[in-house]
């Protein structure tokens, strides 16, 4: 009997046993619906001025949680693009690009992707996060939130809230393994821990957490690379009294990746790119104050992320980030006022960035920096007591390269009845270009030295304006649901000239007559420019029904449609102006902005035969995909295959300290990948996991 059949039999037995168990007290603690990300202070979800979803820490610990990608199925409007952990993976919110999803930990930015200018390790901001055992909940805001959080919050915000109850000794530890039954896909192992240690009365407390994640390499070209990820973090809390808390924080994370020629790498692949690692070090201090009419949250976080490769002298990359954040909330009468000041500075040094004059400078890369100052203010006005809330806010950002930018938003919440709330509003977002995209003296290597993209001093930040209206229903008993309609006008999208006629211009002056342009011997010239943008619109539905006291059905559906609008901008090249219509990039016009399905549906049936046992059965559907490879030739590729998968699992609280979980994902082993089409340049595919079994042992005290 092979291992997959054996595991399947064990899983079926566990589920069957739980279904016939004797029902006992089945009162389950439900999340109280309090969030902080939408406005900067605690409030009920139904009154929050944004479309927001919450995932509890308990959900994370009893499911396979390896990165933020694991939460996508739980939230409408959220999709993983490019596979769970592939080189082009990331989280898209409402059809926007992955780079426009802002990831926060306790309201503070995760700054990692800037050390990954060439990709290869996937979505770093979704991977450099605490383990599930250290997380209290995750809040997901769908729609731009630049008024509170600044640049990058164009598509939405994911805020990871860590545990902060350190009044008594407690801890969690979990060990899990993933066994893939699909041929050629590697297995995974993971260990996590969280410790809360009161040190001296109520004055000092220490929090420790960490993880170790291992994944075997796939055995097919372009599959998942081998990875080894580990983390160790510590936070010391100093609490002189009930109103004041101070913390000192330190964290070290390291992720190693490698590919093997003949497995996921081809013989043609440059060996330099086959082995590389990322190390992130973070340090910070902060203060939290809670008084009668004023709350304060002040922090300074410094982090450094460095990428090294098989040959460090060729392609190192280092990013240093300084972030000072201050936020104050005051309450007076019918108004809740939130205001603050933020400062950030980023230094990036990488030999993927070269001098405009020649190919020299690889051994001694120059460091480039960008800084921003921002002030923000937002007022929630309770016009009618517990009935009508109006939120007005704005953020003024000063960027050293782009000057001042104003990001306003307005949102209205009306509690029509005790069970029905109506919401609607307008929010704006913006994203400044990277340093290497705006300086003509800086070039970024593309296509393995075939193309060098130089900065454009006339580049404008990307901007978005989202309009949404929704209704939320909760009968306070057994039925909850929501519907939201949204439209996002995305302007000034930044595009590069890769895969166009522009690349036939030599990057470093005349080439020998026999040289092919572009090629390694004679790289082609490229640059960045703004196109008109894109329009994204859709509908989000979610429902949650307690069929019985121990039987629940939850589901969400998303319709998402997007169209790129290129316009006909002028590109300034070394040979003079060139209209967009001359570049051979008109193929992008009208295509989807991201590789997100037009239709996405998730449904989960959860049954608790006894208080200690929880079983589930889930179904997931995604329609066909269209992808534009921005920055990688700007190719348009399609995958016309729909995807329908099913999951099931069981978790058992053996006692108050020990929990066992066994899940089967993608039971019928369905993937989009078609090996016969893998080398077709018009065929879109990404690394996927087929049928797999996940087992976890978790202990808490």
Model-based region annotation:
Residues 174, 382-390, 487-489, 512-631, ...:
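Gram-negative outer-membrane beta-barrel transporters
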Residues 121, 166-278:
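Periplasmic-side early beta-strands and strand-to-turn transitions of outer-membrane beta-barrels
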Residues 68-71, 89-92, 103-106, 125-128, ...:
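N-terminal periplasmic accessory domains that precede
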Residues 7-10, 196-200, 237-239, 424, ...:
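Conserved C-terminal beta-signal and adjacent last beta-strands/turns
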Residues 110-142:
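Short acidic/polar hinge/loop motifs at secondary-structure boundaries
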Residues 264-290, 368-370, 419, 428-491, ...:
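Outer-membrane beta-barrel signature, preferentially recognizing the C-terminal barrel domain
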Residues 1-63, 70-73, 195-198, 238-242, ...:
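N-terminal Sec signal peptide and the immediately downstream disordered periplasmic leader
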